[in-house]
Amino acid sequence: MAKEHNHLQDVFLNTLRKERIPVSVFLVNGIKLMGRIESFDQFVVLLKGQDQAAQMIFKHAISTISPSREVVLPQRDAEA
């Protein structure tokens, strides 16, 4: 179950990164950050803002990632 959750998370973040989709990242303390996903791993997301400054955000501090446009995820193999 955890592996599947991480798979969906990875696919979503990787799609945002590859398509360079601008995102709003809302932190658990209410702060809103804006930029593009530059990179990510198991624990952090690297967000690059319009001023090209990078911010490393710990995933446990993220509440929501909201893309600026619709995101079409790649189709997974036939699963029920």
UniProtKB/Swiss-Prot annotation:
Pfam families: Hfq. Disulfide bonds: none annotated. One of its GO terms (cellular component) is cytosol. Residues 10-71 form the Sm domain. GO terms for molecular function: RNA binding. Keywords: RNA-binding, Stress response. InterPro entries: Hfq, LSM_dom_sf, Sm. It comes from the Bacteria. Gene3D superfamilies: 2.30.30.100. CDD domains: Hfq. SUPFAM superfamilies: Sm-like ribonucleoproteins. One of its GO terms (biological process) is regulation of translation, ncRNA-mediated. RNA chaperone that binds small regulatory RNA (sRNAs) and mRNAs to facilitate mRNA translational regulation in response to envelope stress, environmental stress and changes in metabolite concentrations. Also binds with high specificity to tRNAs. Belongs to the Hfq family. PANTHER family: RNA-BINDING PROTEIN HFQ. Homohexamer. This is RNA-binding protein Hfq. It comes from Thiobacillus denitrificans (strain ATCC 25259 / T1).
